[in-house]
Amino acid sequence: MNWIHGSMMNLTGLYHAIRNATGTAVTKPIRKPSNTEIKLLPISLNSKPLETIVWMEPITLIAFGKHLDVLGMIDKTVHNINATTNEIKFTGNDMELGIETIVEGEIIEKGKIAIDAKLFSEIVRKLPDNDITLTTDSNNNALITCEKSKFNIAGKSGDDFSYLPAIIKDKMITLSQFQLKEVINQTIFSIAINDNNKMMTGELFEVNEGTLKVVGLDGHRIAIRNIKLEGRSDDVRVVIPGKTLQEISKILNADAESFVNIYFTNNHVLFEFDQTHVVSRLIEGDYFKISQMLSNDYETKVSINKKEFLDSIDRANLLIREGDKKPIIINILNGLL
């Protein structure tokens, strides 16, 4: 008899988990030796790890789009649900960006399966808020059951899934989830959308003497944010894809007491927080020399209340029609802006 019994959580917890890497959580019995059954129980757990799982898949499909065959599972098109240890692990990976979320559980019999991420996510979103059971057979077909709803979907062998690369945890920095989320949101708008210049689609993360500098630019504007780090901070200078940072920002919480460890290698960056690991390739090459773009030799310098300035821009925008790209004209005269 094949059993997997996972930690208890409700449908909300599952939805949250799927947003993090891929899948479902918690599990229960199986009728045949070749089957694996995962059952979600209606008791809430920490919902944050699960939240990241459903998130992971839609990004991949937007960015990469194709459902590849098993050997080419470049693989965020698929959720891999792995219950081969004492925890249930959800993984999504497209070889550029990968995420893994762990849910603790009592594993009665081990197993794993790869499931179409988009389809699985959509099914979970639409199910009633009650127990969910996922059963697989020897042909990697999956049966998802919740109350009177049943879905049969074809899966693939979890053995052929492309797992996340091992990262050497040498150079690292630590900051709160709130700080990282804020830093990303205050700079990411300045990166380029297309990849005519790939360097502009990423952000510079430079750590020097305990200070993190994050820079984004697109050739027309530049955003720079400096933050003083506490604790260990190794000097690094890397360029992280903007897509990676945008997606990480979505799953970080605003808690100043929850921390993120960021590890850097020559080719990858690893973000560790809660029960989630996110691995991304770095953009290769030397970033622009920011110091040469900035100058203290200016004709006019203005200090202004930020909120009042933003409110004024919002009011001026009322007169600009949607799709119109006319600039806002700023006049500075007699102490007024």
What is the predicted function of each stretch?
Residues K66, K76-L337:
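Structural preference for solvent-exposed beta-strand-turn elements
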